[in-house]
């Protein structure tokens, strides 16, 4: 006999589906838990990376003969080419004139970082394929030469771009831009005499991530609403993560170059310099920012280099948190959320989540990260750190990360329950 064989109910976090957590004992399903959470969430995966919900808002991502509209009468033929996934689902676009191809007009959030991507392959003379979004005040498109595999030009709105050679003549071309409206036009245009294959179009908030196939509706992957979270934080074995409702009050939690984050200086200090999306973050994608704080030759507490954001609040206990590392060595920074005393943190070359909990007494509070000189302050004159995932929440401890864009985001409480369990647990 063993504890396992004697047990009337055993739940080993492993089997689950939407709104359900399976129990190992009994095996007839009578003890399975009903799960609910009316919002998306995040979790730590078995590989140690944070998994967020990702959404491809482009419809019919592999069929350009359906939802997609045509511009300047191209000839679009479905399923002519072996796609990067090995299926014959790549479509061919034969352009008939200038900017001839397919387009789609999805709805997006205004003023938010988005990334487009699509796989393309040269068939005939495809040296100037126009790919991108946002045919508005700030254009977010680029020109790609599918013969050479190079981006030749980028429009003013592009903040970053990349090309990945995935083999067999296919390239994944992507670009990042800030939306300037709520409707953007995703374009894949060629020029007269060009023929090229296309497959796997994607548009998503944030930076480019792994491809998500769609048909008649947008598709989200990750810990979506109603899906239980098996979390591996601090362990090689998962646990069923059940958390209370929390709201991240810090907006643009990963986009520190956004105007939602103030940058300031005092005395000999310099305004922090921010380079967006140039480091791999704890979620495994290149969406962490590098921030350089510098107070120059100053030695007093008036010499400050800082970035900040006002988050409101009430008279209560709040917890701030952030992920940070250096490229090499260590650096000291100071953080406060109560508008008063700074907490000092030593940042190393490994990603860590740092937290601070304070009792706040007002309704206009500030998350501030800085270098400040003085007798009782860190004495490094500058610090270069990689930053990601700032969170400010009402509560005495930090919960799992809640990503935000232009507004605060609430993760609804997890709940797992089993009714009529008396026969199982006596």
PLM feature segments, named:
Residues 1-426:
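Extracellular and organelle-lumenal recognition/adhesion modules and their flexible linkers in secreted
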